[in-house]
Amino acid sequence: MEYEIIDCIDAGTEYCPCNLAETGDCILCSELNSKTFCDCINWKGTCIYQEYIWNGNKAKNGRKHYLCNIVDKKKIDNKLIILTIKVPYDLSQSLVCPGSFVFLRNPSCEEYFNAPISIMDIDTLNNTITVAIEVVASKTKKIDELNKNQDILVKGPYWNGVLGVRHILNAKKGNSIIIARAIGLAPMIPIMKKLCANENNVTLILDKAEYNENFVEDYIKLYNVKVIECSTFDCGELTNDLKKILQNMVNEYDINLIHCSGADILIYKIMEYLGDDFNYSCCNNAKMCCGEGVCGACTARFKGHIVKRLCKLQVDPKYIFEGRRLI
């Protein structure tokens, strides 16, 4: 019997309980979710309700803004920039996990200009983070106005940039597939690193899409991975080339993980094509504004009037598309 295993990415951390506990909307704790009995959905080694009481019946302090310095800026394409940012030691140490991301903002802008950006690479020795940013609208355009040696506001750490994290952590000494397209090449790098660290044979299927060059090539060269470049998506469907590659691989190898870093439609089509017999993980494409589950930008509605806050909810990818209401 299959059932949905859900988790809160912040549970058991220094940021738990959060503001959702104050309004009776905690993802895991029944006592802090408008119920009157103890029935934790997923025990994380600490009692969230007890932490709430000990903290004076209020949420713990949230993430902080840090004024950081841009140590390098590269213009890769007309709409793609790569920033390397010097951050405090404690922040750099908190962003090493797959799925880590931060909110970036031009210091001259108001807080609603915060843009969620996934970590592409992190250097814990020099305390720098590297991010790739697709410049498409107001938030990212204001960030693009900043140049090397100028200051930028960084808010973090956040960790829910990837769904199905448990499958990534559990994938060891096996064969793993990563499919990445367009800007999804950037958040794929920490996943590749983790899978290689866990002694997996990793195959990367990369699609540059509209970009002229593979902007993660230098990172990939540092690891012993197999790279296949092909078009993955065309006219709303998977390409025949991708289908053939995937079919050959699942027939030849015992695959312990399939990770997709791309648009929701690509993730959905891959899972639809290969079925439920595999462990999946994917990038979290939910719209985010506050990162704390409060503003509602990240919410998705499902059958049974269920609302999921995707900036905090950690769940298998198939449950993000199964039973989802579009209206």
Task: Briefly describe each language-model feature range.
Residues I6, I53-K74, R301, C311-I327:
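Short Fe-S-cluster ligation motifs
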Residues M1-D25, H259-K287, L326-I327:
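Short, charged low-complexity linear segments at domain edges
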Residues Y15-N42, D264-I265, N285-P317:
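Local cysteine-cluster metal-coordination motifs and their immediate loop/turn environment
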